């Protein structure tokens, strides 16, 4: 279990203890590669505004520092945040690619070296069905040939089941919890959800 702050600390202060925590998380994931290839990881939280998007981006940065090629996809289609954090346009994104309204090359952005980003894109009415779609799974499978790591920013599990569904085609899941907002009962409920659906939890990150 790692404790980190809320900023893109790996860029602002790479020598900080929070940045070191992200490097520790990176090392833990890389060590797991000996047992199971960890190429697709979804990052979820229990509720909104717990820092999962910040965790996604910081983890992407520390991987990129090892010259690993990283793809970040915003699958929080109801409340997308990645484009806001990185000050990117969200005109077209993953929903447009899967909906055959745009090509991957048109949509993918590179805000930092070795970090590619696909924003959520055009708002769609059936987010859960979208995340369960074979088209999305096939798209992610195809991208695995090009990237060392794919990070999925998924919706909170306490609000919708999208993150649990996405976990079924990911190699591992990281749970982000705000240390001052979650109670034991809520965490136990999420733990039960994970066990029932056999989610492979590879880490828990506590945000301040």
Question: Where do the language-model regions lie?
Answer:
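Aromatic pocket-lining residues of Rossmann-like dinucleotide-binding sites
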Residues: 63
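Short boundary/hinge segments that flank catalytic cores
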Residues: 1-49, 54, 184-208
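Residues that mark the start of a beta-strand
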Residues: 39-42, 67-71
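Conserved catalytic-core segment of NTP-binding enzymes
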Residues: 128-208
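Hydrophobic positions on the alpha1 helix immediately C-terminal to the Walker A/P-loop
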Residues: 55, 59
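Conserved, well-folded catalytic cores of nucleic-acid-processing
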Residues: 28-32, 66, 100-101, 146, ...
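P-loop/Walker-type NTP enzyme "switch/lid" segment
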Residues: 2-23, 27, 34, 46-47, ...
């Amino acid at each position: 279990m790692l404790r980190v702050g809320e900023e893109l600390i790996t860029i602002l202060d790479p020598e900080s203890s929070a940045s070191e925590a992200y490097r520790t998380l990176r090392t833990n994931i890389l060590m797991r590669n000996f047992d199971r290839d960890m190429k697709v990881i979804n990052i979820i939280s229990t509720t909104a505004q717990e820092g999962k998007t910040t965790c996604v981006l910081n983890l992407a940065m520390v991987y990129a520092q090892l010259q690993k090629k990283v793809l970040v996809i915003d699958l929080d289609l109801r409340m997308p945040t990645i484009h806001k954090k990185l000050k990117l346009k969200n005109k077209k994104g993953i929903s447009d690619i899967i909906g055959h309204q745009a090509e991957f090359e048109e949509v993918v952005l590179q805000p930092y070296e070795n970090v590619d980003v696909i924003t959520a894109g055009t708002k769609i009415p059936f987010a859960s069905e979208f995340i369960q779609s074979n088209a999305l799974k096939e798209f992610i499978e195809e991208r695995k040939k090009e990237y060392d790591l794919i990070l999925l920013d998924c919706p909170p599990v306490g609000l919708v089941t999208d993150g649990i569904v996405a976990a079924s085609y990911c190699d591992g899941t990281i749970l982000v919890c705000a240390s001052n907002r979650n109670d034991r009962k809520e965490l136990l409920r999420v733990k039960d959800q994970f066990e029932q659906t056999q989610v492979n939890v590879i880490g828990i990150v506590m945000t301040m």
